[in-house]
């Protein structure tokens, strides 16, 4: 048999196998566009704007439909009612983490974000308990964030009102809060280890959100057999893991079980106390992976939201003026903002909520998977099926938020100017997998933004109407375009 004949037979076999799997897999799944062999619906999706593609499909197939990403079926939920019904009303059945091949290669089933089953339940329970022990929701954590907010102000003063890219400085602040929780201590913004950690984390988020990584996740064979930026991610992860394991080793050598200092100490104590079954879940590798998850989730999401916020505040100076007027009235110029102030600052609270709604940071959520065969709206979704929930369709629902494509804090204010909650506000996801650090993120956004606006004016290098809001990258998360700002003392 010559090579050409062999290749033709191999390709034909793959196509037939793909067609057979798709026909068998369709079963009672929701409707959707007809997939091509092997590549599925990949060519019908705009990988630079997946959210819009999902919206277009929903118009044709309804709020629950099926796409084939490669040869694997993925059920998509579009609109508040479908998303709520799955994540909240059927939270347990939709509580597994869906497949992201590149992330699976990085985490190997470990950590708090991408693990499943008993391992995920154990590590999530431990993490939430430990964060509470370390002061989450209490004055202790608030003190740390306030301290970091003042350090942030000092760094911003050093720019002396000159044009600067705020990316690095705005990343340092939330990263240092996580450092204080994980390692007990914060880092100086010039510390070499800190700078390297920041660089690796930021680079990985950009690459993981790129169109190329979406291609790799749809066709996992590319990860092992093709060159590309994904190899840089793996190299960075290896560096971060090595750094974290060294920090863990230092903690092991100085551990006092009667006086835990930070997250690592609590974990090491838990490891010593764990029974035979739990010991498998509380390995040092799982600790390193969990810390990496906390850094990635706790640093990049908050810092990116802050970057978007400054960009929006420059584009809408009337909003900035109202926020600063409220800051001056409630807080003044001579004391640090605190969380109690938020109850008396409805416009500022509404502005921060509107930033999160408008930017739609994680457009399609992190994929879920069903834990068992489930009948959902007369469709049968088999156990293990990946489920994508469109947060864009919830946060930009015109029935809940009139003119959703406009930035308007009024979306979260009632007729009397009081803050108005919305069940559609899901930037942290919802249900069993809601972000474990939601409380910390809300605190950081309020304290960092109010402290910045208390001390500085924001000046754009271009006219406000010319400020570009189109995301630089719009994959796993939406990253804002690069910009410069003049941060001028008030």
UniProtKB/Swiss-Prot annotation:
Location within or outside the cell: Endoplasmic reticulum membrane; Microsome membrane
The Gene Ontology biological process annotation of the record reads: arachidonate metabolic process
Q: In which tissues is it expressed?
A: Liver.
Classification via InterPro entries: Cyt_P450, Cyt_P450_CS, Cyt_P450_E_grp-I, Cyt_P450_sf, Cytochrome_P450_fam2
What SUPFAM superfamilies does this protein map onto? Answer: Cytochrome P450
Q: So what does this thing catalyse?
A: an organic molecule + reduced [NADPH--hemoprotein reductase] + O2 = an alcohol + oxidized [NADPH--hemoprotein reductase] + H2O + H(+); (5Z,8Z,11Z,14Z)-eicosatetraenoate + reduced [NADPH--hemoprotein reductase] + O2 = 11,12-epoxy-(5Z,8Z,14Z)-eicosatrienoate + oxidized [NADPH--hemoprotein reductase] + H2O + H(+); (5Z,8Z,11Z,14Z)-eicosatetraenoate + reduced [NADPH--hemoprotein reductase] + O2 = 14,15-epoxy-(5Z,8Z,11Z)-eicosatrienoate + oxidized [NADPH--hemoprotein reductase] + H2O + H(+)
Naming one, the record's GO cellular component terms include: endoplasmic reticulum membrane
Superkingdom of the source species: Eukaryota
From the UniProt record, give the pathway where this protein acts. Lipid metabolism; arachidonate metabolism
EC class, as a word, reads oxidoreductase
Q: Does the keyword Metal-binding apply?
A: yes
Which residues are listed for heme binding in this entry? 435
Pfam families listed in its UniProt record: p450
Q: Which interval of the chain is the signal sequence?
A: 1-25
- Keyword annotations from UniProtKB, A to Z: Endoplasmic reticulum, Heme, Iron, Lipid metabolism, Membrane, Metal-binding, Microsome, Monooxygenase, Oxidoreductase, Signal
Major localization listed first in the record, in broad terms: endoplasmic reticulum
What's this protein's function?
Answer: A cytochrome P450 monooxygenase that primarily catalyzes the epoxidation of 11,12 and 14,15 double bonds of (5Z,8Z,11Z,14Z)-eicosatetraenoic acid (arachidonate) forming 11,12- and 14,15-epoxyeicosatrienoic acids (11,12- and 14,15-EET) regioisomers. Mechanistically, uses molecular oxygen inserting one oxygen atom into a substrate, and reducing the second into a water molecule, with two electrons provided by NADPH via cytochrome P450 reductase (CPR; NADPH--hemoprotein reductase).
Q: Which family does it belong to?
A: Belongs to the cytochrome P450 family.
Q: From the Swiss-Prot or TrEMBL record, give the protein name.
A: Cytochrome P450 2C39
- In its UniProt entry, the species of origin is given as Mus musculus
């Amino acid at each position: 048999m010559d090579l050409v004949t062999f290749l033709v037979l191999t390709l034909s076999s793959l196509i037939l196998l793909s067609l057979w799997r798709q026909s068998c897999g369709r079963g009672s799944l929701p409707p959707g566009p007809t997939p091509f062999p092997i590549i599925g619906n990949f060519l019908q999706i705009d990988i630079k704007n997946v959210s819009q593609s999902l919206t277009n499909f929903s118009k044709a197939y309804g709020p629950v439909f099926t796409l084939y990403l490669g040869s694997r079926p993925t059920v998509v939920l579009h609109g508040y009612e479908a998303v709520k019904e799955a994540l909240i009303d059927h939270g347990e059945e939709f509580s597994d983490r869906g497949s992201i091949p590149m992330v699976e290669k990085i985490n190997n089933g470990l950590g708090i974000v991408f693990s499943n089953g008993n391992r995920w339940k154990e590590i999530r329970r431990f993490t939430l308990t430990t964060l509470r022990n370390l002061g989450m929701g209490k004055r202790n954590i608030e003190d740390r964030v306030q301290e970091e907010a003042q350090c942030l102000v000092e760094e911003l003063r050093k720019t002396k009102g000159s044009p600067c890219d705020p990316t690095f400085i705005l990343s340092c602040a939330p990263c240092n809060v996580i450092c204080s929780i994980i390692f007990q201590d914060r880092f100086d913004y010039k510390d070499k280890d800190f700078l390297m950690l920041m660089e690796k984390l930021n680079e990985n988020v950009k690459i993981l959100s790129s169109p190329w990584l979406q291609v790799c996740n749809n066709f996992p064979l590319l990860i092992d057999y093709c060159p590309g930026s994904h190899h840089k991610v793996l190299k960075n992860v290896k560096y971060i893991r090595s750094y974290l394991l060294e920090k863990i080793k230092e903690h092991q050598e100085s551990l006092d079980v009667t006086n835990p200092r930070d997250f690592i100490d609590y974990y090491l104590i838990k490891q010593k106390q764990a029974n035979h079954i739990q010991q498998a879940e509380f390995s040092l590798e799982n600790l390193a992976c969990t810390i990496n998850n906390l850094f990635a989730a706790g640093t990049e999401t908050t810092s990116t939201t802050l970057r978007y916020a400054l960009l929006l505040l420059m584009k809408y100076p009337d909003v900035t003026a109202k926020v600063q007027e409220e800051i001056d009235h409630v807080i003044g110029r001579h004391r640090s903002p605190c969380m109690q102030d938020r109850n008396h600052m409805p416009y500022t609270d509404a502005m921060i909520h509107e930033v999160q709604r408008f930017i739609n940071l994680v457009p399609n959520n992190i994929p879920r998977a069903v834990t068992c065969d489930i009948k959902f709206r007369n469709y049968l979704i088999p156990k293990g099926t990946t489920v994508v929930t469109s947060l864009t369709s919830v946060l930009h629902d015109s029935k809940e938020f009139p003119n959703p494509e406009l930035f308007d804090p009024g979306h979260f204010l009632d007729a009397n100017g009081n803050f108005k909650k919305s069940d559609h506000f899901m930037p942290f996801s919802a249900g069993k997998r809601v972000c474990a650090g939601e409380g910390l993120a809300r605190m950081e956004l309020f304290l960092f933004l109010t402290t910045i606006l208390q001390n500085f004016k924001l000046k754009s290098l271009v006219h406000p109407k010319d400020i570009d809001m189109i995301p630089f990258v719009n994959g796993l998360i939406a990253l804002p375009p690069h910009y410069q700002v003049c941060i001028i003392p008030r």
